[in-house]
Amino acid sequence: MYNEHLDGNNEVHELYVIKRSGKRVVFAKEKIEKAIAKANAEEGIIRNRLSSDEISSIAEQIYKSASNAGRDYSVEEIQDMVEDALMDTGKHSVARLYIKYRANHAERRKLTAVDKKIVSIIDLQNEEVKQENSNKNPVVTSVQRDYMAGEWSRYFTNEYLLPEDIARAHQEGIIHFHDSDYFAQKEHNCDLINLEDMLQNGTAISGTYIDPPKSFSTACTVTSQIVAQVASSQYGGQTFTLSHLAPFVDVSRQKIRKRLKTSLSEVGIVFTDDQLAGLAEKELIQEVKSGCQTIQYQLITLQSTNGQAPFVTTFMYLHEVPEGQLREDLALIIKTMFEQRILGVKNKEGIYVTPAFPKLIYVLQDDNIHEGDKYYYLTELAAKCTAKRMVPDYISEKKMFELKGEVYPCMGCRSFLTPDRFTDAGIGNIARSHNYDESKHKYYGRFNQGVVTINLVDAACSSGKNFDKFWDIMNERLELCHRALRCRHERLLGTLSDVAPILWQDGALARLKPGEVIDPLLYNGYSTISLGYAGLAECVYYMTGESHTSPDGRAFAIKVMQSLNDACTKWKLAENIDYSVYGTPLESTTYKFAKCLQKRFGMIPNVTDHNYITNSYHICVREDINAFDKLSKEAEFQPLSPGGCISYVEVPNMQNNIPAVIALLKHIYNTIVYAELNTKSDYCECCGFDGEIQIVEDTSGKLVWECPNCGNRDQTKMHVTRRTCGYIGTQFWNQGRTAEIRDRKLHL
């Protein structure tokens, strides 16, 4: 909507407005003049009409005000400025008619808002939706269908399902009610799949019974089918463990030995047991390779009903199975998975690139982290894989035992279950799984009910740096989040097991009967529900003037985090629901929060003056700090984020410096529960460049991706892989997240 303004260097920049569709367009003063003129021309006005010069003056006044702010404005903000300017002139009749004119248009827009958004999705004109999820391609028909359904669900959620104050707080960026595009239906967030029960005891997929697999390769195929079905029945991520596949390696081993023994005997070949075992092992290795390849390719080529490949994590933990042949078989699977991921997968041009899924998590433990350890060779492979493909991520067995008393994976990206308390309480097998063992704690088959996030930056800025006021605001906002979380919980109450048989009846999460409700699984700590938080870095900086890496900043940050945990403990004790604190992985919402903050508080240096805010407890991406210090300092916050946390360090190309990667892994093992290394893995299809594709500004100030070798800016002709939050994105990002990616400083 603007023309141009001068920055501090007297350089001319065009000013822009963000339309309701999310599209960024040049601001035109004549649109303001035209809207005011319509109100001014109404028959009801006899006196107090505005002259054409006065109308032009108002438009110029708004232009100057917007110019001085140095940021983009939304259409609604511009209209607010017009109303204020009209009232300031004393021409109240014109102002009232303009407000009425605006309200009438708003009502007409309201009646067709969903229709317009759906049309903009189909026509590929909705910038917000196009960059909402970095693993969804908005051009594809099936993805568009999911987005269309999501727009209706958002509307229905805001208008009918949520209390007005919660919906308004969400729209204003005070809190974030996650996944409202799925809230119309009774779906949960993320989970740990009880693959062992399904594979060992049989399951059903789309009404067809599946017997326990008779080979490793079949088990891999069935696993891929289960993952796809689960992904279509929930909106969050899922995790399965390779430990549940490991027993089928020996099933294949015995099957191969039996077949070879028969075949060799039939042709009269004499052989020893060792020779037979050697031949069988060679064939078995090929089957393991084939099975792992099946999982890799099926999981990135299958598409769930939510318009993307399943958001799935594969867990690799050697101590999850007993010592002996079973552990050796698990090690073989892990080794094979690493080798195949290092190779990558071919894109349609036949070039090996980095796949987004499955995300891999490898546990660092006392027999794989030191040179000379029995399984050190796997950690070396993991380091090479990280340097090339940005996975696996790492959990420290040592630190997780200290924090939770056990080792188990996160659900998808970073959401962790609370330690099992229902087994200790003697509540028993409420999910009726066929592999329940009352002598062990249970994690696979449990899930998360959903997330609501508090914007810590807004709470801080709303206080005006008054600490007493800050804590009052925090208490109010936390109770708002609590009520929003209750909405999530109550939405799931009464859900029939029939809505998702793969989850509730056939073993992924439970084996309930048709017609039964899932209500018992929502209490007693079987599932969790998450209080998310974002912007701790900016919150602390605003209130203290320091980073939370400083002693004073850290002390205040710890108090903020403790207040979140205290709230969750209070709610949990009162309701018998496991509320937990979750470090929110804002993706597109980081841009929304930033824009809402700028609208409410203007540009505050190092607080609201960027188009993103910092995820969870993370140190600001613009802060200079080395990798080891970053991990050490952030490790202090992970115990205060028990429902979800992950830390990362940004590193250059490490493929020729694996010892440095190993050094970081050793530091992770000794220091922090859960961490990852971010590298770059890009490819330009125009010139074949393999390296880091750059983020640059185009002539309008928009951030775009450019090949440093040939200058290609066509996103359809490049493969860019970046860590979005806790997972890898490959479909590009909105302007806020892109700016955050650009600003990330290297830590090595």
What residues fall within each predicted segment?
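Conformational switch/transducer regions in large eukaryotic molecular machines and scaffolds
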Residues: 28, 702, 724-727
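Metallocofactor- and cofactor-centric catalytic cores in central/energy metabolism, strongly enriched
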Residues: 288-289, 296, 542, 737-743
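Short connector loops/turns at beta-strand edges and beta->alpha or beta->beta junctions
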Residues: 37, 41, 457-461, 541-542
